[in-house]
Amino acid sequence: MPNTSSASKRLRQNEKRRLLNRATRSNMRSTIRRVREAVENNDLETAKNEFKVAQKKLDRAAANNLIHKNAAARTKSRLNNLIKNAAQTA
């Protein structure tokens, strides 16, 4: 229970930010999952389109300190390699 008005305000801000971050993180993970599923189903067009969306969401999350910039770069690299390998085998 907050004892001061500033503590009450921080509590409200933290809750609001937590919900926004949670939604953003969930959205980002869903997009990454769609890329992986498209690659598994050998649907390279969809995979490439979803990858573009995933790149944007990962960069936005890194810019807002939701994830580390290196984690975003690593995830983008791995997704890109997945798509490239699927294209070579197809």
Curated annotation (Swiss-Prot):
Superkingdom is Bacteria
The alphabetized list of GO BP terms reads:
translation
InterPro entries reported for this sequence:
Ribosomal_bS20, Ribosomal_bS20_sf
The protein's matches in Gene3D superfamilies, at most eight in alphabetical order, are given as: Ribosomal protein S20 (1.20.58.110)
Specify whether Phosphoprotein is a keyword of the entry.
no
Cellular component per GO, a single term:
small ribosomal subunit
Q: Where are the stretches annotated Disordered?
A: 1-28
Keyword Lipid biosynthesis assigned to the entry: answer is no
Keyword terms: Ribonucleoprotein, Ribosomal protein, RNA-binding, rRNA-binding
**GO MF term set:** small ribosomal subunit rRNA binding; structural constituent of ribosome
Q: What residues form the membrane-spanning segments?
A: none
Outline what the protein does. Answer: Binds directly to 16S ribosomal RNA.
For this protein, the record's PANTHER family field holds: 30S RIBOSOMAL PROTEIN S20 (PTHR33398), SMALL RIBOSOMAL SUBUNIT PROTEIN BS20C (PTHR33398:SF1)
Stated family: Belongs to the bacterial ribosomal protein bS20 family.
Q: What is this protein called?
A: Small ribosomal subunit protein bS20
Native source organism of the sequence: Rhodopirellula baltica (strain DSM 10527 / NCIMB 13988 / SH1)
Identify the coding gene. rpsT
